[in-house]
Amino acid sequence: LGVLMVVGFLGLFLKLWRDNVVNDADREWKKHMGEMLKGNKASMPPVGKYNYGQKLVFWAMAVSLAVLLLSGFLFWRPWFSPFFPIEVQRIGLLLHAVSAVVLIAATIMHVYAVIWVKGTARAMTRGTVTEGWAKANHALWYRDMTKGP
């Protein structure tokens, strides 16, 4: 099951990782993240295609899936576990458990954010957003998408 999760996410990762690199606009947004959590969206600085919180969820999922895959090999019976001492397997189990908790928490945050921010479900399921939504939620990305050649 874990290998299938990684394979399923790999295509998404390869497609989206460049858009999820943290930049200066994200660092500025991060400074005001508390305002967003309080519901004071109007005071948030403009962001690109993804905001810092979205990028944080992306990287939490990517890293935790990678750690789950690698740590899983350490105790995958009967194929790989015989090659590793029990101490290494125990460390692998601990890393595996921590990574699973991180992945589950990131998934819960992701689902919550989809419900919390109106218009996000449409963006995820259809791949499109309205012009007003883009302007209000991702002003820098909107500007990049609407500027002429």
List where the protein language model places each region.
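Membrane-embedded alpha-helical bundles that constitute the cytochrome b-like, heme-associated redox core
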Residues: L1-P149
